[in-house]
Amino acid sequence: MSQVFDASAFLATCSGRPGVYRMFDGEARLLYVGKAKNLKKRLASYFRKTGLAPKTAALVARIAQVETTITANETEALLLEQNLIKEWRPPYNILLRDDKSYPYVFLSDGEFPRLGIHRGAKKAKGRYFGPYPSAGAIRESLSLLQKAFSVRQCEDSYYANRTRPCLQYQIKRCKGPCTDLVTAEEYAEDVRHSVMFLEGRSQQLGNELNAEMEKAAMALDFEKAAELRDQIALLRRVQDQQYIEGGSGDVDVIAAFVNPGGACVHLISVRGGRVLGSKNFFPQVGIEEEVAEVMAAFLSQYYLGNAERELPGELIVNVVHEDFNAITEALHTLRGRELTISHRVRGTRARWQQLAVTNAEQALNARLANRQHMAARFEALAEVLGLDEVPQRLECYDISHSSGEATVASCVVFGPEGPIKSDYRRFNIEDVTAGDDYAAMHQALTRRYGRIKDGEGKLPDVLLVDGGKGQLNMARDVMQELGFTDLTLLGVAKGVTRKAGFETLYLNDVHHEFTLKGDSSALHLIQQIRDEAHRFAITGHRARRGKARRVSSLEDVAGVGPKRRRDLLKHFGGLQELNRASIDEIAKAPGISKKLAESIYASLHSE
């Protein structure tokens, strides 16, 4: 079930400018992308009490979060909306056809190189393009390149072991170099075109493709001309969305916005005159911090604090600070690069500067509204639980498994400002009877609170457990064993109907049973934390289960240890391809004898 969305609190800070909005459910899955000439007016129409179409009502019932991006005009909103729909294919749209290092597009070496996403140190031989501000932005570029030029994006191990073309060939996203369906010369031309696009030379590329199209048409090769026409159309669409008129070079457009509740820095990345994407940062700030101080601190930490971060030639900012000269000099000394920090800009550059300011302000206002809303929920919870003070730290635990397989317990932490994700924890449960949720909860709580007793971590004000009477009794037993007898315990059980809003709650023991009204702010907080614990548990469980299933069939083979298992899976591109391999094919893998290959084959096909 999705957490309850407070539409009135959101709309109170929503902009009336043109833009794009994205609606998510309680598990952060994108439900719908839309555009609007007036974001506030359009979004308000979703939350009317009457007159909604059945499909719209079903969508609204699942909304847990709404995000917006302000654009300069409705046309830009339309272009961005279409790109997001193509990339994410949200279920409620009409469909016609995020401190990690920043990702790059990587082009490998070799006769038939691959394109892919790369993070971290640049150790592999090849070319790197970027950095991109987000994985979404980089996937958009890779998707466009795959549609236009069909350069492969599969892993080398998968590519090396293909005996027939894969689905990407069937849907015309790859030309099948793995099975010699394209010549090296033709493939090299596709790679060259891809590089031109990634280098920001789309205008030159478009002219070249247009000349080739006319040449193909003159030669009556209409199939080739149509293919080139489609490539040109794709390039024009991305140019309309991503290019700054009259712009060139590498630029970061940065705006800081501060009000009494916090600060936001919005960064727009432009490379080769092309907008790659944007990102919000929310630095911790003191009371009445000056916006120029926030900007200077951000530039110092963001650019000086990471030697691997690629520097643009120019930073466009919305405020000035006396430290800017020192920052540019330090960057020149440490990185050997000249960099200009610009404040007074004109034309299109001024327009993008203002858009960065607008997005920073909107993002901060939305964040602060959520904080205030969360604080009110904490106050309501304190009242219904009869606490003398508003709790400052809530922890919630949940268990996830598949018929006892790969059991994982989750711990999520919330404060009056929202989730404290740095304090989230997962526990891989071992040595308990399969499917015994009580034993799993006992192990997780004992491990967590045993560390707290030893001085590691903070004790919460309220401990929530999902599961009702049995899990509450288990939590109480553990707390008594460890001496935390004053900790407030809250059990959350689904009601008889098992519908959201009808939960049964137990305070400290199973005899203190009560329910809350469906519109209770305290209940909404409990639901939100419970659902977040469930989400965090199930994602951890799925990852653990997937990892176990990838290697379990090889674990009992004598002579195949962890390193050899990894090497085998890497060589074949995964367990599925290894399962398809014959004994002779397995024996060709590095370090695998014919006898060992027979043992591996027998283990994989034992059922």
Curated annotation (Swiss-Prot):
Domain GIY-YIG: 16-94
GO biological-process terms attached to the record: nucleotide-excision repair; SOS response
Domain of life: Bacteria
Compartments, record wording: Cytoplasm
Pfam families according to UniProt: GIY-YIG (PF01541), HHH_5 (PF14520), UVR (PF02151), UvrC_RNaseH (PF22920), UvrC_RNaseH_dom (PF08459)
GO function terms (MF aspect): DNA binding; excinuclease ABC activity
Main location as per UniProt: cytoplasm
The keyword Electron transport is assigned to this record: no
Record flagged with keyword Oxidoreductase: no
InterPro entries (alphabetical): GIY-YIG_endonuc (IPR000305), GIY-YIG_endonuc_sf (IPR035901), GIY-YIG_UvrC_Cho (IPR047296), Hlx-hairpin-Hlx_DNA-bd_motif (IPR003583), RuvA_2-like (IPR010994), UVR_dom (IPR001943), UVR_dom_sf (IPR036876), UvrABC_protein_C (IPR050066)
GO cellular component, one term: excinuclease repair complex
PROSITE patterns listed in its UniProt record: GIY_YIG, UVR, UVRC
Assigned protein family: Belongs to the UvrC family.
PANTHER family: UVRABC SYSTEM PROTEIN C, UVRC/OXIDOREDUCTASE
Function comment: The UvrABC repair system catalyzes the recognition and processing of DNA lesions. UvrC both incises the 5' and 3' sides of the lesion. The N-terminal half is responsible for the 3' incision and the C-terminal half is responsible for the 5' incision.
Quaternary structure and partners: Interacts with UvrB in an incision complex.
Protein name: UvrABC system protein C
Species name: Pseudomonas putida (strain ATCC 47054 / DSM 6125 / CFBP 8728 / NCIMB 11950 / KT2440)
Highest classification ranks of the organism: Bacteria, Pseudomonadati, Pseudomonadota, Gammaproteobacteria, Pseudomonadales
